[in-house]
């Protein structure tokens, strides 16, 4: 058998693995690249296989970096089953059409501008019809149910504890007299997350394809509820708003769960709470109607509140654009949860535009922020940022609450793997920025005494039973991380020219500052030299 790595290589997004077993081909995940414009442009590239030859897709969970290119796959000829859990199908039924609307809107906008310039018509990456046709191919499988994907390949979904419906994949492959056991982790969640169950214990495998999103980090053990309460109380005292860019699926529901608990305990005031995202509204409804996936605490609360997981009189779900716009006209402090979680699109941009300049407001990030996104730039301390074409001064307090991550950290992943009965022959380590993948791979090798490999895009693992060898890709493709670095450095060049002009004006008006400015610039120059020496 062969496994070709066609996404999430040395980056976090775009998960896609092509498996070839004899004459049969199928995929595990088919996700979108997310982040900067240059990284998202990778979605436009042709698949490195013919979609019509793919017999099936095994989908680990609904997040679009794992599911988002399924409509494109169908558009280009795929007609096989897409296997997933019930909740994953329900969540994809809102996520995929939403992505299609975005693609259609971006194409329409590009064509309006392009027609005036005489440019070629731009086709959307995929349409709402493509998303609908993809959803009709979904085949539901329960956790713990073994099923055949193609001849000789059996798959079982196990609880991954990442989001509702998320699964890691246990796979058994029989080729002649050779048998291979594989695990594809998808995304593994933190233990003790609210609402959903912890990741199930895996029995072991010959080879594991592991995520590494937080492979170089340890989640801080601290009182998340307490910090959230402090942020809200401090902001209300200042008279501002709490704006939370949050993933519509998973994070929004966890935040509501915490707010309900804090209010019930009298730790935060009962100010208006707005969920301003049609997708988050529907995802919350899906979460409320799947109690079979709740953990013990959530099940008890659900029963106690009359089959309602979240019940707050001050909670508002906005549907229309008019309702969304009206939020910023309402006096008094409020909490606004809106998508997207990385602040790179959606209604959250309007709320950032209205609140970033305000010293009394707070912006709270409670999730991973990919390279190149507005969220990443804000948590890294940028002082001015362009939102919806407007240059905005960042005066609001910016908080980065890392403990809310739905991804296991390095220690949690190591503990999960150490609990397995058998050590695999090798770990393949995609789904992480290079520094995270490298640190996790090193830790796995040292702690478990097993081989590790961090794939490049297009690399292929050839496996016979428990023997394996890598075939490095001959394709020339710049890694997403390198693409993003190039874009970042272009931004640095623009910033340098702006700063140079400002410095020259300051010194022209205040010649006595020239010596001080030169000394500081010399320090900066030396610092840049030191960086290059370290490389």
Tell what function each PLM region has:
Residues 1-52, 133-197, 322, 326-329, ...:
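Core dinuclear metal-dependent hydrolase active-site scaffold
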Residues 52-54, 76-79, 234-243, 269, ...:
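Short, surface-exposed connector motifs at secondary-structure boundaries
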Residues 99-163, 291-330:
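Metallo-beta-lactamase
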Residues 9-11, 21-80, 84-134, 188-197, ...:
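Pre-active-site segment of Zn-dependent metallo-hydrolases
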Residues 161-166, 173-175, 179-205, 212, ...:
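Active-site-proximal loop/helix segments of hydrolase catalytic cores
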Residues 219-301, 423-479:
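Binuclear metal-ion centers of metallo-dependent hydrolases, dominated by the metallo-beta-lactamase
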Residues 261-264, 311-535:
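C-terminal regulatory/interaction regions
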Residues 28-30, 54-63, 70, 82-85, ...:
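Active-site neighborhood of phospho(di)ester-bond hydrolases with catalytic His/Asp-centered motifs
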